[in-house]
Amino acid sequence: MGRAYYSGSISSFLMAEEDRILGWLMIEDSFRTEDVQKNAWRAEIQVLKEQIASFPDGEIAFEFTIPRIGHRVDVVLIIQGIIFLLEFKVGDNTYAKSTKDQVMDYALDLKYFHEASQDRTIVPIIVPTEAADQANTLSLMGDGIAQVLCCNRHNIGSVLRQVLPQMHASPLSMDAWLDARYAPTPTIIEA
């Protein structure tokens, strides 16, 4: 199993059949995939096929494993060198603080321990699929991590189009990002 259950260009993702992508995700899942998870992945695939179609030059990864904490980011998008972390809550209708904290923890962990993320802008996004639209303002902290943006199933694409012109980065390939060294800070005993 690689660091992500599925990765590729957005254009390839858009052309692939939904069931084929779902199959790849299920093959990579080392646990017995429950129907709830299958349905969540199916919903994420459907939403993203609609919402990111205008970014065919970007790249996408599903279920990226963060080694230090053992959690998985639902979706990573790399568009124009910017890293977007999407945490879906399929069926939810509120922008929960716990979900914002969860995706921010992922962003912080990547920023400080993942070599290919350290000098990059990282934009964490929560996606409770049934939530009402919420206004978003891009606000970057000093370390290059944005405040969490809030999207639903209908506005991911428009939020990406709103924030991308405000940021600039050199190109970054998903393969290079996935293969980058993960180097946690040594503990006191190790130091």
Go through the PLM ranges and name each one.
Residues 1-185:
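Accessory nucleic-acid engagement/destabilization modules that flank
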